[in-house]
Amino acid sequence: MAGSHPYFNQPDSTHPSPPSAPPSLRWYQRCQPSDATSGLLVALLGGGLPAGFVGPLSRMAYQASNLPSLELLIWRCLFHLPIALLLKLRGDPLLGTPDIRSRAFFCALLNILSIGCAYSAVQVVPAGNAATVRKGSSTVCSAVLTLCLESQGLSGYDWCGLLGCILGLIIIVGPGLWTLQEGTTGVYTALGYVEAFLGGLALSLRLLVYRSLHFPPCLPTVAFLSGLVGLLGSVPGLFVLQAPVLPSDLLSWSCVGAVGILALVSFTCVGYAVTKAHPALVCAVLHSEVVVALILQYYMLHETVAPSDIVAAGVVLGSIAIITAQNLSCERTGRVEE
């Protein structure tokens, strides 16, 4: 009998259990970022950081060639059209399947409205302030709309991070509100802040509508429709409301090209992130755009950055750290038997 063999009856001390895996390997196998964490990291690195360059570069193009906001929107939409080739190669319909086509068009329309408001706002208010108002309003609206429409709540740490982002918004925008008493300039400043707020509201609605689209080529379809809808709406408006202006120098052309590429990268990363994490958390992490915009506002546009702006940037970064730390989770691949 195998159980009576001397080999099996030896004391346990002479035959210890096999050595465990190296600690580093076990940690790597046991701890993996959750889907929410992966989405937030993509939103931070691929969505917020590239988007922080868009506002200052748009301002530079406007200052160099007086490039109207509608024309800048047209150039940006042109970068979305080549996605049609990808859809054709995959054999997917350009306008989406019939059951989701109306929602996909509505999502694209909201995206264009959000971009248009952002471009208009950045021409009359500082780039960092415009980005802060837009991202702050999108964060608040996303939290409220998701809670009301999807009944998807947030943890206490998440709410703490959201409130920190809103505090950063108030610190940045608060001093600028005093300019509303300076006649015509104050009126334009107020309109710029209103446009930035409406841009954030449209962004939050777009993210919620996008989350409701469930079909494989969702992201490239919405990206192509955004370019198509933007061109159909902007080209007639450009000739009616503004005079077309071609970029006059290499700097303007470089800014236009960089805006188109960076904006498309940001759009793609945000579209991926919002399917993995709560829309309000994605919008909060996108506040990293504000920090980048403030840095570029000082070094590239040579615009004054107030001490309150620096404090607000620190508050925003701290809030993003809280949200990210809360969503960092370790998924165990196995349990240790006692």
From Swiss-Prot:
Residues 1-24 are annotated as: Disordered. Keywords: Membrane, Repeat, Transmembrane, Transmembrane helix. Its main location: membrane. The chain crosses the membrane at residues 37-57, 67-87, 105-125, 160-180, 185-205, 221-241, 250-270, 281-301, 305-325. Expressed in testis. It comes from the Eukaryota. Residues 49-174, 272-325 form the EamA domain. It is a multi-pass membrane protein. GO terms for cellular component: membrane. It is found in: Membrane. Pfam families: EamA. Belongs to the SLC35G solute transporter family. The gene encoding this protein appears to have arisen by SVA-mediated retrotransposition of the SLC35G6 gene in the primate lineage. This is Solute carrier family 35 member G3. The gene is SLC35G3.
